[in-house]
Amino acid sequence: MSQVVLRNRFGIYLHVPFCSKKCDYCSFATWTDRDHLVEDYLQACKAQAREAASSIRSISSVFIGGGTPNLVPAQLLMDIFDGLPLHPDAEFTVECNPDHVTPDDLEIYVDHGVNRISLGVQSMVPHVLASLGREHNPDNVHNSVEIIRNAGIKNLNLDLIYG
């Protein structure tokens, strides 16, 4: 890693490529059959983050996307960011699938500074969800929003697809 110290704040995107099912519209690098690699992948991400941390003064935003980040163990995911120089006002986002939102995971996220959830809703219309290859239903979305709000997260993004 270069010895250049980055003086300005900047953002980090972490791609978590694991999914329970590949959505029909998805063109991202994702895996549905490699759960055995989750722990090694997250450990490699943690090692890379530690190596880069020596050049980072302040991280202004973190976005964990995928894939389905909330499909992997929340504590292992959050361990990647322990000790990194997050700015006190950093926006820290985890992308979530409505089928996998749990109070326990949200508690871990909040304890590690997550203050924004991006919920992969795509649609609230059952036949549209089916045509997209999505497994969740509108009730899962309502339940997920309630869990997210109860965890104290006020900044919530709902991803929607139109067209």
Place the predicted regions along the sequence by residue.
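N-terminal [4Fe-4S]-dependent radical SAM core
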Residues: 1-12, 55-58
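Structural motif
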Residues: 9-11, 23, 91
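Short beta-strand motif preference
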Residues: 12-14, 119
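Local cysteine-cluster metal-coordination motifs and their immediate loop/turn environment
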Residues: 15-30
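Conserved non-cysteine loop/helix-boundary elements of the Radical SAM core domain that shape
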Residues: 30-55, 59-163
